[in-house]
Design a protein with these regions (language model features):
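Histidine-acidic metal/acid-base catalytic patches
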Residues: 1-17, 24-27, 44, 142, ...
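Catalytic domains of carbohydrate-active enzymes, especially glycoside hydrolases
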Residues: 3-12, 29-62
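Active-site acidic/histidine proton-transfer and metal-coordination neighborhood
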Residues: 4, 82, 94-200, 204, ...
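Glycine-rich, aromatic-flanked loop segments that form ligand/cofactor-binding clefts
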Residues: 7-17, 60-90
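N-terminal small/glycine-rich loop or linker at the start of catalytic domains
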Residues: 8-27, 87-102, 134-140
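Active-site-proximal loop/turn and secondary-structure-junction residues that shape catalytic pockets
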Residues: 16-18, 60-64, 86-91, 134-138, ...
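Short, acidic/polar
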Residues: 29-46, 112-120, 215-224
Length: 393
């Protein structure tokens, strides 16, 4: 089980290390990064203690710099690499009524050009994925032409996709509501799947675990998209009500376990052209990323805890006796099949995962090791003055 954890790599979002909050308040914290370089340094610290977070995702324009080659070199010096490039078409006044779906061709072209600029950044950073999440939608029935907006979205995505390189991908994220309340232009996995399927093999779906209605069977969506070869990436977080962006696994660790079981079942950790059960299929080169906002808790420990939660639920999912499970399923043994799954879920894997870390020269307890490292006190003393990174900065 532990050897298979070597395949687990969790990308960290640069914005998780900046200040964030709610529509009521954004709280500042000592030591918060003021530059993208300081965000990368914090992300590299998470990787140094966990060994499972080798890349950092950037958000444009929040993380815009003049020299991306130099930024990549800075990241490499700190033991990580630059990863997914995330676009932003939700913080400009021109996008009040939409971006890629806007009725005004000039606004649509502005949004398209932003994504082309993101692809240019990818060419400089060596990033594989361009991630698109759109706030586009409407608040009232009749406000917009639902079908017309889908047509414009398809045209805009096609204009972007033709610039995606042979070794690059576009991933389209969906969200069932917010900020739009009546109709969101990419509200569900079906819409994302339809749009990316029309583009080509290098267009995939991004699944954010907090972007579903309560009670949604997310692991079914995972299984289906992996089956179709269209699940490109995850945004991991946790939620109690809506898109809460809490630490992954905090609200429902059993759900995270079930998701990771289907990821493993579909070959999502292998990144090769066949499924782990040997049945063939599209396989996956799946990206696992955190997308969280640490509004009240400390940011670096919050990211460490998140990585540990994914690792531990993955380890539990790897313990499922799949042969016994298949036999019970084929025999119609309802309770037996459920029991096999639950036995794995209830197994305490923390000692085994700790051994995995120590065998690789990592601390057995990353949370404690970070707390004792003095890193937070050091950056709190050093990062005085300037403007702390936050939404839009």
């Amino acid at each position: 089980m532990t050897a298979q954890l070597d395949d687990l790599a969790i990308e960290l979002p640069s914005w998780a290390f900046g200040n964030s909050g709610t529509r009521f308040k954004v709280f500042g914290t000592p030591g918060t990064p003021r530059t993208v370089e300081e965000k990368i340094a914090d992300a590299a610290t998470v990787h140094r203690f966990t060994g499972m977070a080798p890349t950092v995702a950037l958000h444009i324009p929040w993380d815009r710099v003049d020299d991306y080659a130099a930024l990549g070199a800075f990241a490499a010096e700190h033991g990580v690499a630059l990863g997914t490039i995330n676009s932003n078409t939700f913080q400009d006044d021109d996008y009040k009524f939409g971006s890629l779906t806007h009725v005004d061709k000039t606004v649509r072209q502005k949004a398209i050009d932003h994504h082309l600029a993101c692809i240019d950044i990818m060419n400089q950073t060596g990033s594989r994925d361009l991630k698109i999440w759109l706030a586009d939608g409407t608040n009232y029935p009749g406000q917009g032409d639902i079908r017309g907006r889908q047509d414009r979205l398809a045209e805009s995505l096609a204009a972007i996709y033709q610039h995606v390189g042979d070794d690059q991908r576009m991933v389209l994220e969906y969200k069932f509501f917010e900020p739009a309340m009546y109709m969101t232009d990419v509200p569900d996995w079906g819409t994302s799947f339809v749009q990316v399927s029309a583009l080509g093999e290098r267009a995939k779906v991004c699944l954010d675990t907090g972007h579903h209605a309560p009670g949604t069977n997310i692991e079914f969506i995972v299984a289906q998209l992996l089956r179709l070869g269209k699940l490109g990436s995850f945004d991991f977080n946790s939620r109690f009500y809506a898109d809460d962006d809490l630490i992954v696994g905090a609200a429902d660790p059993f759900q995270l376990f079930r998701i990771m079981f289907e990821v493993i079942r579909g070959g999502g950790l292998e990144g090769r052209g066949e499924r782990s059960d040997g049945e063939g299929g599209a396989g996956s080169d799946l990206a696992l990323m955190l997308d969280q906002c640490h509004n009240v808790e400390a940011k670096i420990p919050g990211q460490i805890r998140s990585v540990l939660n994914v690792a531990e639920m993955t380890a539990r999912a790897l313990l499922v006796d799949t042969d016994a499970l298949a036999a019970a399923q084929e025999a119609g043994d309802v309770l037996g099949a459920n029991g096999i799954l639950m036995d794995a879920f209830y197994t305490d894997v923390r000692p085994a995962v700790a051994r995995w870390r120590t065998d690789r020269g990592l601390p057995a307890d990353p949370m404690r090791a970070f707390a004792e490292s003095g890193y937070q006190d050091a950056v709190s003393a050093e990062r005085v003055g300037g403007t702390q990174s936050s939404w839009g900065a």
